Amino acid sequence: MNKKLLRHIFKGLTNPNNKSYIKVDKDIHYIMPDMACAVRIEATDNPFVPGKAFNAAPEGVDRLFNKGADAVKLLLTGELTVDGWRDVRTLRSKDGREIYIDNNYLNFLSDEQQLLLYLDDKSVKAIRDDGIVEAVIAPLRSKH
C-alpha cells in the first residue's frame, strides 16, 4: 500500500472537524474512509505521528497495522442499524457490544453501499488482556 493511498485513507481522520471514528466503550477505534474496518490505536502508537511505520498484507483482505504494536487479529461482527436517539448508526456485535458510528462517516458511503463487518472465529487468534488488536480492512459490500 503506497503512501498516497495511506494519505487518502487517513484524510478524514486527520481533520479534527471531520470526526470519522467509532467508539467502543472508552477505547477509540477509527473508521477508515472508503473501507469497512475498525482499528484500535493505543495512545502510545499514534499512527499520525511522523515516522511511524505501517504495513499492509494483501491476502484477500488487507490488514493495516502499526508495526510498533504487538497486535492480534480481530474482525468485528455485526451490521449497521439506525439509532435515532443518538443520531448515529449502531453496530451491534454478536457478543453484545455496541459500536456507535458518527454520521459524518456515512458521507463516504454511496446509496448503493452498506457497511457490514463480519466475525470469523478462525480469524481471531488471541486477544491480549490490554485489548490491542490488529486492524482488519474489508471492502464495502453492496446491499444488492
Language-model features: where?
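DNA polymerase processivity clamps
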Residues: 1-144
